[in-house]
From Swiss-Prot:
<feature type="compositionally biased region" description="Polar residues">
    <location>
        <begin position="352"/>
        <end position="371"/>
    </location>
</feature>
<dbReference type="InterPro" id="IPR044257">
    <property type="entry name" value="TRM32-like"/>
</dbReference>
<dbReference type="InterPro" id="IPR025486">
    <property type="entry name" value="DUF4378"/>
</dbReference>
<feature type="compositionally biased region" description="Basic and acidic residues">
    <location>
        <begin position="331"/>
        <end position="351"/>
    </location>
</feature>
<protein>
    <recommendedName>
        <fullName>Protein TRM32</fullName>
    </recommendedName>
</protein>
<dbReference type="Pfam" id="PF14309">
    <property type="entry name" value="DUF4378"/>
</dbReference>
<feature type="region of interest" description="Disordered">
    <location>
        <begin position="295"/>
        <end position="379"/>
    </location>
</feature>
Length: 552
């Protein structure tokens, strides 16, 4: 297919449709697209460095005509040449330059002021004025940008000194060369120098800030060290003062009771490493009972020496306490003296009685008593608890007829020996068999008053101990000595309300004692609460089972 299609006018058969040309030519004739042009692209030769652009002949033809090209070049040059009125306008001055020129003319008119300015330059330099903040920056409408050279040659007017001009001279660096200021815009070198100077200024400011921060941190650290040193010195001084006061108090009687006791303990430890026993408070149970219990036993020479040492230590403690109390009040001192005399007498009496008993005893009983003495010596440094006091109480109670009767009843019934006491019960409300009452009357040699009452109290105590055993958290049922202690405690408590002292009491007092003061009285609802919890558990369990059966 050719680049140029033939028009219908150029064809020989004009006005007729030529069927021999083909269907594509017919479509192009219909669209009236007679000139079909191709896009001219540059052709790259050998290397990408050298490019030659090949144009079609039709595009190169108009540029080959020299006349047309010359006329075009002349028109372009004519457009670039400035005209005379335009050059005159460019030579005109800006508004800023005009204002400066007018100010200068006004200064020249006033000859006196001009002469003073020329003569007194040194005085003006010696009294510099502080510039306003906006004066260091260029005005928004200025014709040229601010440079370092401009800042070095700024002129400022001081209206208070009759229009005197203040000249500012900034010291320049040796590296910067003095260049004349041209009225036209600055070059690229000036911009670079100005930026370099600003950067150097910021660096210097940064260094100054870093140095100030370092100095500040150093001063803070020094202050902290000083404060710590001062605090340490204060603590050392205070401790030294306390030590001095303590040393003074040790020499005199100004020490507290705790310090006195510790000081005396140290002395006693230095003498002999034996435990020290102090006098107990009068409100608590005294150790007289323990002393009588110990005096019943034979003692060796070692035990006698221990007693003498304990008595000496007690005397020293009594003397120290006496000196403190005598300073407080003479009445207390007199009471303490009387009390000490009584204690000394009681101790002497116990010692005499013990010596007499030791002489009366036979030599065969000595080894057994020595064993008991050794046991008591081991108990003394450890301190005696409630169990030891209870043992002594029971030894005293062996002589009591009531206690012996209760013990015999429990032995004969079998509650002391067997653990399973439920098998021995006569009935639910009465655990003891009533026939035991007559058997004990036959066996007993000594007569006891109110045997039936004691028998009923033992029955009641057995029932209470059985009910007192916890249901929800069950424990082992007591037997033996423990069971005897529980039963006798309940019987003794009930007997204490039947003495001669309680005969004058009213019925309300007796009922209140039974209801409120008794540990297992009517107000103790532990058993009932446990039964209720068990019943609630059963009900909840039954409801849950019913729901599960209904669902499935």
């Amino acid at each position: 297919m050719g680049k140029h299609l033939k028009n219908e006018s150029s064809s020989p058969n004009h006005g007729k449709y030529n069927h021999k040309l083909g269907w594509l030519a017919g479509m192009l004739h219909v669209l009236d697209f007679h000139h079909w042009r191709t896009k001219n692209r540059p052709i790259c030769w050998k290397t990408p460095r050298t490019h030659s652009l090949m144009r079609e002949t039709e595009e190169q033809e108009p540029f080959l005509d020299s006349k047309i090209n010359d006329s075009k070049m002349l028109s372009v040059v004519a457009d670039n040449k400035p005209t005379r009125p335009e050059t005159k306008l460019k030579k005109t001055m800006t508004t800023k330059q005009v204002t400066e020129y007018v100010d200068f003319l006004e200064i020249l008119r006033k000859e006196d002021v001009f002469v003073k300015i020329m003569k007194d330059q040194v005085q003006i330099k010696s009294n510099p004025r502080v510039l306003p903040k906006s004066g260091s920056f260029p005005i928004s409408g200025s014709s040229r940008p601010a440079r370092i050279q401009h800042k070095q040659k700024e002129n400022w007017y001081a209206p208070k000194q009759n229009g005197a001009v203040l000249t500012l001279k900034v010291p320049r660096d040796t590296s910067q060369e003095c260049k004349p200021i041209s009225p036209s815009h600055g070059s690229a070198d000036d911009d670079h120098g100005f930026n370099h100077a600003i950067i150097n200024g910021f660096r210097e400011i940064k260094k100054l800030l870093k140095n100030t921060l370092k100095d500040r941190n150093r001063t803070k650290k020094k202050k902290k060290k000083k404060v710590l040193d001062v605090a340490k010195d204060d603590y050392v001084g205070r401790y030294s003062q306390l030590l001095k006061q303590i040393s003074r108090r040790e020499g005199g009687d100004l020490r507290s009771k705790s310090l006195k006791l510790s000081y005396e303990e140290k002395k006693s430890d230095s003498r002999d490493n034996k435990p020290q026993f102090f006098r107990r408070i009068s409100s608590l149970s005294s150790l007289e009972v323990l002393g009588s219990f110990l005096t019943d036993l034979p003692r060796d020479s070692s035990t006698s020496n221990q007693e003498t040492r304990i008595s000496e230590d007690q005397d020293t403690n009594f003397g120290a306490k006496k000196s403190v109390l005598s300073s407080e009040s003479p009445v207390r001192a007199e009471k303490e003296e009387k009390y000490e005399v009584q204690e000394e007498r009681s101790q002497e009496n116990h010692l005499d009685s013990s010596n007499q008993r030791i002489l009366q005893q036979e030599p065969d009983s000595v080894p057994s008593t020595n064993k008991t003495a050794e046991k008591t010596e081991t108990l003394l440094p450890q301190g005696l608890g409630l169990s030891s006091l209870e043992i002594y109480k029971h030894e005293e109670e062996d002589e009591d007829a009531y206690f012996c009767y209760v013990k015999k009843v429990l032995k004969v019934s079998g509650f002391l020996e067997n653990k399973d006491n439920e098998e021995k019960w006569y009935s639910e409300e009465q655990p003891l068999n009533p026939s035991l009452l007559y058997e004990l009357d036959i066996q007993e040699e000594e007569t006891v008053n109110d045997k039936e009452l004691l028998f009923d109290l033992v029955n009641e105590a057995i029932v209470e101990t059985q009910n007192h055993s916890q249901i929800y958290f069950p424990k082992t049922f007591p037997y033996g000595k423990r069971y005897l202690d529980e039963v006798w405690g309940r019987v003794e408590w009930s007997l204490s309300g039947l003495g001669a002292e309680n005969r004058d009491r009213s019925l309300d007092d007796i009922v209140g004692r039974d209801l409120l003061t008794k540990s297992d009285g009517w107000m103790n609802l532990q058993g009932e609460s446990e039964w209720l919890t068990l019943e609630l558990e059963d009900l909840i369990f039954d409801d849950v089972l019913d729901e599960l059966l209904c669902v499935y």
